Design a protein with these regions (language model features):
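Short aromatic/hydrophobic "clamp" motif used to bind/position activated sugar donors
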Residues: 86
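Short, acidic, metal-binding catalytic loop of nucleotide-sugar glycosyltransferases
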Residues: 26-36
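Glycine-rich, basic loop-to-helix element that forms the pyrophosphate-binding segment
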Residues: 65-81
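Cell-envelope/extracellular polymer assembly enzymes that use nucleotide-activated donors
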Residues: 7-9, 38
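A conserved acidic beta->alpha catalytic loop
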Residues: 27, 39-54, 66, 90-94
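Flexible helix-coil transition and linker loops at the boundaries of alpha-helical arrays
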Residues: 197-201, 233-247, 276-283, 317-341, ...
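Catalytic-site signature of metal-activated, phosphate-bearing donor transferases
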Residues: 75, 95-223
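Alpha-helical repeat scaffolds
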Residues: 223-233, 264-276, 302-315, 360-373, ...
C-alpha cells in the first residue's frame, strides 16, 4: 500500500431505501475496521432522514441528482476514490460475512490479481427462502482509464489482470417486489434504456443478452421469443467469438418462451436444434435438458422426462469442477443459474411427478424430502403445480400422496400459493368431491375445504371428520349452486 493511500475504496449508491440502508452499512463495518479503507456514498435520495443516516457512517457523502444513468452516478463515486482497489455496492445489498474479503487483502493475495468476484445472492421472496447465486465482479484494482460504462447494468472497463473468486456472499433484495406494478415499473425503466444503447451500438452483444433477461424476468414471452429468434439469426452476432458462450442465453430464452406459451412439442424441437449447435455451451445444454424434461412432463411422457433429469444431474460435476471455465460459461444469463437452488428444485419436482405417476412410493418420499416443502417449491416452477395436483387426485390412495397433501395443508402460505397458481385444478378437485368423501380421504377433504374456509375454523373440526365431510359436501354444493 502506498503511503497515506487507502488500500480499498468502498462506494455505495444510496437511494430512498431507508429500510435496508443501515443493514448494508453495518455489513461494511468489519471491512472498514480490518482494512485501510474509505467509504464514499453517492446519495441519490430525496429524504432528509437518509442523509442523516449516511453521515453516521462517513463524511464522504456526495449528493447526486438522479438522471436515469447508473454509470454517471457510479462514476461520481469512482472519481473521488483514492484507494488501490475499488468495491461498489447498492443499498439493498449486504454482506453476510466479509471475512474472505478481509483475508484476501490482509494476506497480500490481492497483489497477484486485477479484479475479484464474490457471490451475489438474489432473493425473490420476503422470507428469503428462494434465491439464486451469481458471481459478480464488483472489486477491481484501480487504473487511470477505468470507468463505469452503460446507463444500466453498468460495468467497469478497462480492467486488467487475472480474476479471483472470493467465497463471500452479498445478499440482495432488489428482486423482491411488493406489487406487480413495482415489478413492471422496473421493466419499463430498463427496457427503453437497453433499446437505446442497442441502437447506438448494434453489434454489442452485452445489451442483447441483458434485454433477453429483462423480457424473461417480466414474463414477456412473445417478445422474448421474437427477440431470441432474431438474435440467433443475426450475422453480426454470429461472427463474434463470444457468441460461442453467450448464444446459450438466446436458446434458453427461446425454449422457455415457447414452453410458457403452451407449445411443448415445438419447445422440444427447439431443444434438439439448440443442443446440436456448436454455439451452445455445455452449461446451456444442461439448462435445456431441464427445459426438455419439463416439456415431457407437460406431455405426461414420464420416462423421457426422467431420462432428461438424470442427464442434467450427470453433467453437473463435469461442468462445475473447473471453476474458471464454469465462470466463463456463466456469463450467459438465464443459463448462469442452471444449477442454482431454484432450478434444482425444478429438477427434483419433475422427478417427483414422474415417480408419483409411476407409483414409485419410496422415490416420491425421498424426493419430497429433498424439496424442503414450502412456498419456494411453487416459486420454482408454478407451471408444474397443476400437474402435481392432478396426480395427487389420480393417485390419492398412496402413502406418498397423503404425505404431500398433509404438507400442503400444514403450510398455509404454500397452500394459498398453490390455490392461486392452480385454480382450475382446485375446481377439478371440487368436482371429484364425492370420491373423496366416499373413500374417506380425510386429509384431502381438509385441503378441499381450505379452498373455501378459514384455517382457524377448520382446525376446530379435526377431531370430527365425518361432520367435516358433510360440511364439505354442503358447502361446495352451495358454492357451485351460486355459480350457476
Amino acid at each position: 500500500m502506498e503511503h497515506g493511500r487507502p488500500l480499498l475504496s468502498i462506494s455505495l449508491l444510496a437511494s430512498n431505501r431507508i429500510g435496508t440502508i443501515r443493514r448494508c452499512l453495518d455489513s461494511l463495518l468489519p471491512i472498514m475496521e480490518h482494512l485501510p479503507c474509505e467509504l464514499i456514498v453517492v446519495d441519490t435520495s430525496t429524504q432528509p432522514e437518509v442523509r442523516e443516516l449516511l453521515w453516521e457512517y462517513t463524511d464522504r457523502v456526495i449528493p447526486f441528482w438522479w438522471c436515469n444513468d447508473f454509470s454517471k452516478a457510479r462514476n461520481c463515486g469512482l472519481s473521488e476514490a483514492r484507494g488501490e482497489w475499488f468495491l461498489y455496492i447498492d443499498d439493498d445489498e449486504w454482506f453476510e460475512n466479509a471475512d474472505e474479503i478481509i483475508r484476501f487483502f490482509n494476506s497480500g493475495e490481492y497483489h497477484d490479481y486485477g479484479y475479484a468476484n464474490y457471490v451475489q445472492r438474489n432473493f425473490f421472496d420476503p422470507e428469503y427462502q428462494t434465491y439464486t447465486d451469481n458471481w459478480v465482479s464488483r472489486m477491481v484494482r484501480l487504473n487511470d482509464e477505468v470507468r463505469f460504462r452503460s446507463k444500466i447494468h453498468e460495468y467497469l472497463d478497462p480492467v486488467y489482470g487475472k480474476g479471483k473468486n472470493i467465497k463471500a456472499i452479498a445478499n440482495h433484495t432488489g428482486y423482491i417486489y411488493a406489487t406487480e406494478e413495482e415489478r413492471r415499473k422496473r421493466y419499463e425503466r430498463n427496457v427503453p434504456l437497453l433499446k437505446e444503447m442497442m441502437a447506438e451500438k448494434p453489434d454489442q452483444l452485452r445489451w442483447a443478452i441483458q434485454l433477453v433477461q429483462e423480457y424473461y424476468s417480466a414474463e414477456e414471452w412473445k417478445e422474448l421469443e421474437r427477440f431470441c429468434r432474431v438474435a440467433l439469426q443475426n450475422e453480426n452476432y454470429k461472427q463474434q467469438p463470444v457468441m460461442k458462450r453467450l448464444a446459450a442465453t438466446f436458446y434458453a430464452g427461446l425454449v422457455e418462451s415457447v414452453l410458457e406459451q403452451n407449445r411443448a412439442d415445438e419447445a422440444l424441437d427447439e431443444v434438439r436444434k439448440a443442443v446440436s449447435s456448436e454455439n451452445c455451451s455445455p452449461l446451456g445444454v444442461a439448462y435445456l435438458l431441464l427445459q426438455e424434461a419439463i416439456g415431457y412432463a407437460e406431455k405426461r411422457a414420464w420416462n423421457e422426462a426422467k431420462e432428461c433429469i438424470e442427464k442434467y444431474f450427470a453433467l453437473e460435476k463435469e461442468i462445475t469442477e473447473d471453476e474458471e471455465q464454469y465462470a466463463i460459461w456463466q456469463e450467459a444469463l438465464i443459463v448462469d443459474s442452471t444449477y442454482d437452488m431454484i432450478n434444482k428444485k425444478k429438477a427434483y419436482l419433475v422427478l417427483l411427478l414422474c415417480n408419483l405417476a409411476q407409483d414409485n412410493e419410496a422415490e416420491v418420499i425421498c424426493l419430497f424430502l429433498k424439496l424442503e416443502w414450502n412456498q419456494s417449491v411453487v416459486y420454482a416452477y408454478p407451471r408444474l403445480m397443476p400437474i402435481l395436483l392432478e396426480l395427487l387426485v389420480e393417485h390419492a390412495k398412496g402413502t406418498s400422496a397423503e404425505t404431500i397433501w398433509r404438507s400442503i395443508w400444514d403450510h398455509k402460505q404454500l397452500c394459498d400459493m398453490m390455490i392461486e397458481e392452480s385454480r382450475k385444478y382446485w375446481e377439478r378437485i371440487a368436482i371429484t368431491k364425492r370420491t373423496f368423501l366416499r373413500e374417506n380421504y380425510h386429509e384431502q377433504v381438509m385441503i378441499l375445504l381450505s379452498r373455501y374456509y378459514k384455517p382457524e375454523i377448520l382446525n376446530g373440526y379435526t377431531l370430527c371428520l365425518p361432520d367435516i365431510a358433510q360440511r364439505a359436501l354442503g358447502l361446495i354444493d352451495e358454492i357451485e349452486r351460486g355459480k350457476e
